[in-house]
A protein has these predicted regions:
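A conserved short beta-strand
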Residues: 132-144
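Serine-hydrolase catalytic machinery in alpha/beta-hydrolase-like enzymes
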Residues: 7-28, 32-106
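Alpha/beta-hydrolase fold nucleophile elbow
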Residues: 104-116
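Gly/Ala-rich beta-loop-alpha elbow adjacent to hydrolase catalytic centers
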Residues: 115-119, 123
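C-terminal catalytic histidine-bearing segment of alpha/beta-hydrolase fold enzymes
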Residues: 160, 165-200
């Protein structure tokens, strides 16, 4: 019998740059549901890094990638301040700008927040301070596990880390969240060092 043709690989995603009034532009991949998926890069990291999983992610909602609010010392990249209220307001404004510009339905009331490294700390803070707006959090490659006082009202938490990255602290954090009765899952990214999403 003839061999079956391999399924076509998905084309890489090309994010759309959307201007936001009185703020930096955001990068957007329109999704298949009305859920906004907020992506926060790492310290001096790459806001386009989410492209590695955008094809899978857009099935769950519209991905909106933000740029940190503080400049790094060298180059043009950015990092995050600890003003969670200001970040939440930035996200709300950006969601509205994306809805207006692209004419797509986005429900701002329930957001998934995804943070990488330093961005995971900001994602944790948003999910802790505003649990109704950020009921689900994905924390990737965090420099520490979530604090014991964090995520008390979260519906679900996913902790991810590269299998070539420091990860014992995140495994232990997952166990602590489980003991607190949280709905939490731990995943390792194959062939991934810090700053990478690996081969999967």
């Amino acid at each position: 019998p003839a061999e079956e043709a391999a399924p076509p690989s998905e084309a890489p995603v090309d994010p759309i740059k959307i201007k936001v009034k009185l703020d930096k532009p955001v990068l957007v991949v329109p999704g298949e549901t009305a859920t906004p998926i907020i992506y926060l890069h790492g310290r001096c990291g790459d806001p386009t890094a989410f492209s590695a999983w955008a094809n899978a992610g857009k099935k769950f909602g519209t991905i909106i990638s933000f740029t940190g609010d503080q400049k790094c010392k060298h180059g043009t990249r950015t990092q995050w301040s600890v003003d969670d209220g200001a970040l939440d307001r930035r996200i709300t404004r950006a969601i509205e700008a994306v809805k207006q510009e692209l004419g797509i339905e986005i429900d701002p009331s329930r957001r998934i927040v995804i943070g990488y490294s330093q961005g995971s700390l900001r994602a944790e803070a948003l999910a802790t301070r505003f649990p109704d707006r950020y009921p689900r959090a994905v924390l990737i490659g965090g420099p520490r596990g979530p604090r014991e006082t964090s995520l008390s009202k979260s519906e679900a938490v996913l902790i991810m880390v590269g299998d070539h990255d420091a990860r014992q602290h995140l495994r232990e954090a997952t166990e602590k969240l489980e003991k607190r009765g949280k709905r939490v899952r731990y995943l390792e990214l194959p062939d991934a060092r810090h700053g990478e999403y690996g081969s999967a």
